[in-house]
Amino acid sequence: MPSAPHYSSKYYDDKYEYRHVILPSEISSLIPRDVLLTEDECRKLGIRQSDGWEHYANHKPEPHILLFRRPHSGIPNDVDYL
């Protein structure tokens, strides 16, 4: 059984909430490089997040790291701000 994805803490700029997900090699080997996944495809691979997260980029030097974002309506007081 593959190990589970690792989820970063959330971080923010003035428009988006961000996080990255580090996939175990068993899962990352199933994803073609330079492909952005839909929310449904992410769930089928075992990536579990609340609704609205967009897979907007892959970390080129480390393709097992997927970058996600979603719009926010305000930044919580206890989080990192870019």
Swiss-Prot record:
<keyword id="KW-0131">Cell cycle</keyword>
<dbReference type="GO" id="GO:0042393">
    <property type="term" value="F:histone binding"/>
</dbReference>
<dbReference type="GO" id="GO:0000307">
    <property type="term" value="C:cyclin-dependent protein kinase holoenzyme complex"/>
</dbReference>
<dbReference type="GO" id="GO:0019005">
    <property type="term" value="C:SCF ubiquitin ligase complex"/>
</dbReference>
<dbReference type="GO" id="GO:0061575">
    <property type="term" value="F:cyclin-dependent protein serine/threonine kinase activator activity"/>
</dbReference>
<dbReference type="GO" id="GO:0051301">
    <property type="term" value="P:cell division"/>
</dbReference>
<dbReference type="InterPro" id="IPR036858">
    <property type="entry name" value="Cyclin-dep_kinase_reg-sub_sf"/>
</dbReference>
<keyword id="KW-0132">Cell division</keyword>
<comment type="function">
    <text>Binds to the catalytic subunit of the cyclin dependent kinases and is essential for their biological function.</text>
</comment>
<dbReference type="Pfam" id="PF01111">
    <property type="entry name" value="CKS"/>
</dbReference>
<dbReference type="GO" id="GO:0043130">
    <property type="term" value="F:ubiquitin binding"/>
</dbReference>
<dbReference type="InterPro" id="IPR000789">
    <property type="entry name" value="Cyclin-dep_kinase_reg-sub"/>
</dbReference>
<comment type="similarity">
    <text>Belongs to the CKS family.</text>
</comment>
<dbReference type="GO" id="GO:0007346">
    <property type="term" value="P:regulation of mitotic cell cycle"/>
</dbReference>
<dbReference type="GO" id="GO:0019901">
    <property type="term" value="F:protein kinase binding"/>
</dbReference>
<protein>
    <recommendedName>
        <fullName>Cyclin-dependent kinases regulatory subunit</fullName>
    </recommendedName>
</protein>
<comment type="subunit">
    <text>Forms a homohexamer that can probably bind six kinase subunits.</text>
</comment>
